[in-house]
Amino acid sequence: MVKGTTSFGKRGRNITHIRCRRCGHHSFNVRKGYCAHCGFGRSKRIRRYSWQNKKAVTRIRLV
């Protein structure tokens, strides 16, 4: 029963993610059954959030 360095060598054997059918990214989790990138398998809508992209500066400078 070891939980240290020897156990960490056994982590990379099984496949966690495969290529997604919808978005094509290597983000489809085999065990959970959904894509971490687009949300395929979890929802019909594509996973998108407002915080993914930087906001454009819309403030006008007062002179």
From Swiss-Prot:
Transmembrane segments: none
Co-factor requirement: Zn(2+)
One matching Pfam family: Ribosomal_L37e
A GO BP annotation: translation
Keyword hit for Transmembrane: no
Cofactor note as given: Binds 1 zinc ion per subunit.
Gene Ontology molecular function, alphabetical: rRNA binding; structural constituent of ribosome; zinc ion binding
Family: Belongs to the eukaryotic ribosomal protein eL37 family.
Its biological purpose: Binds to the 23S rRNA.
Protein name per Swiss-Prot or TrEMBL: Large ribosomal subunit protein eL37
Source organism: Thermofilum pendens (strain DSM 2475 / Hrk 5)
